[in-house]
UniProtKB/Swiss-Prot annotation:
This is Prostaglandin-H2 D-isomerase. The modification Pyrrolidone carboxylic acid is found at Q25. Monomer. Forms a beta-barrel structure that accommodates hydrophobic ligands in its interior. One of its GO terms (cellular component) is extracellular space. SUPFAM superfamilies: Lipocalins (SSF50814). N- and O-glycosylated. Both N-glycosylation recognition sites are almost quantitatively occupied by N-glycans of the biantennary complex type, with a considerable proportion of structures bearing a bisecting GlcNAc. N-glycan at Asn-78: dHex1Hex5HexNAc4. Agalacto structure as well as sialylated and nonsialylated oligosaccharides bearing alpha2-3- and/or alpha2-6-linked NeuNAc are present. The lineage of its organism: Eukaryota, Metazoa, Chordata, Craniata, Vertebrata. GO terms for biological process: mast cell degranulation; prostaglandin biosynthetic process; regulation of circadian sleep/wake cycle, sleep.
Amino acid sequence: MGALCTLWLGLVLLGVLGALQTSAQAQVSLQPNFQQDKFLGRWFTSGLASNSSWFREKKNVLSMCMSVVAPTADGGLNLTSTFLRKDQCETRTLLLRPAGTPGCYSYTSPHWGSTHDVWVVATNYEEYALLYTAGSKGLGQDFHMATLYSRTQTPKAEIKEKFSTFAKTQGFTEDAIVFLPQTDKCMEENK
């Protein structure tokens, strides 16, 4: 009887955890009819929101960076970002692997070794893209980030407002949302 109760309890817990996971993922929608070929090219990281302790510590010294999105042979994307770090330009490339539905990708964090999921939530391809990233940095350390990409270094006020609204719907507070200041440094590296 005890083993049966333990088995039942385990199944209930799995069901609850599965429902919680589905509920969290259901909050993030994808850009309808995502067209990867229109998403390619140069983007500027204009806004960020994150629950990461690293982000909270560094958000006041971050500046805008440039990223170039290029296709891979397997249908994924290379996301090459150039940013200012300790007065020098640094470039990093992430391989975003297709993860089912168009606009959904995954990558392995070079720092943590964990897998993160990335969703292209909304884009008009010509001005802005809203992305949401979720993953884990270890046991009990869930990582969430909202990103505003813009095709120019000066996104329109309504695009910034759209990003703020999106970030807040994902549970980020006002103080966790940052619009990155423009810089002339490291903006020509990936052209």
